[in-house]
């Protein structure tokens, strides 16, 4: 399915989006009923867990899912969303399609029914979500070895960094100090996948960073 945009512009806020995701995941046919159990937004993507039951109360039989104890099955769905000229739009797909977007939280995955085929696209998608959730959230002073060298915008590379932070608009923001040069860089969460904690030394914001910004505006930041 392609993108569908709401040209009436009735979807404007987070609450509007969640209400629409709920509506899209809640419907009933002559034989089955679908109900949204949980929806989470990560970035611009919504992740949903939808439960299917039979209207007559019998057990739901499905070729892909193991039926739960209450006779239902619950599957995962992904909704890509974006705004185009003020109009909200979405593109949806079930987990069985193996969506590229794979940042569903573990609390949502826990609601999904067991899969029958361990080699299915859905199984691989769930594993990618778990791998994403397993990426460490490092703290101030943690010294880290990245799984592979990361190429920076100036063409140099780094692999051993220490977590620190800078302030912008009164808020703390994560950055990393490169071991070899002392340079401060920002790294995406995906670049931390498979990284290893070498040591931990808690501390305040980097004194190097404080000196670096001493003569600059408060809202300056690492590149």
Task: Label every PLM stretch briefly.
Residues 86-126, 177-223:
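Intrinsically disordered, low-complexity, charged/polar segments
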Residues 22-72, 150-163:
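Amphipathic, interaction-prone secondary-structure segments
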Residues 128-133:
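Short alpha-helix capping/helix-loop boundary micro-motifs
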Residues 17-20, 32-33, 59, 104-108, ...:
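Short amphipathic alpha-helical segments that mediate assembly, nucleic-acid/protein binding
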Residues 154, 160-190:
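Basic/aromatic-rich interaction segments and small domains that mediate binding to polyanionic partners
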Residues 136-150:
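Short coil-to-beta transition motif at edge beta-strands of beta-rich domains
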């Amino acid at each position: 399915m392609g993108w569908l945009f709401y040209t009436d512009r009735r979807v404007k806020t987070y609450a509007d989006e969640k209400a629409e995701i709920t509506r899209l995941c809640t419907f009933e046919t002559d034989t089955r009923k679908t109900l949204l159990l949980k929806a989470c937004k990560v970035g611009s993507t919504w992740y949903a867990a939808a439960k299917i039951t039979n209207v007559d109360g019998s057990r739901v039989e499905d070729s892909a899912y193991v039926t739960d104890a209450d006779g239902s099955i619950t599957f995962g769905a992904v909704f890509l969303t974006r705004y185009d000229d003020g109009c909200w739009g979405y593109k949806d797909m079930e987990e069985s399609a193996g969506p590229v977007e794979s940042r569903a939280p573990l609390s949502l995955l826990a609601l999904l029914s067991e899969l029958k085929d361990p080699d299915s696209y859905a199984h691989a998608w769930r594993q990618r979500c778990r791998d994403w959730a397993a990426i460490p959230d490092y703290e101030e002073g943690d010294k880290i070895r990245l799984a592979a060298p990361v190429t920076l915008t100036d063409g140099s590379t780094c692999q051993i960094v220490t977590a620190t932070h800078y302030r912008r608009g009164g808020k703390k923001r994560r950055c990393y100090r490169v071991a070899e040069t002392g340079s401060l860089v920002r790294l995406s969460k995906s670049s931390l996948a498979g990284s290893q904690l070498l040591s931990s030394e808690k501390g305040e914001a980097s004194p190097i960073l404080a000196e670096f910004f001493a003569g600059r505006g408060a809202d300056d930041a690492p590149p």
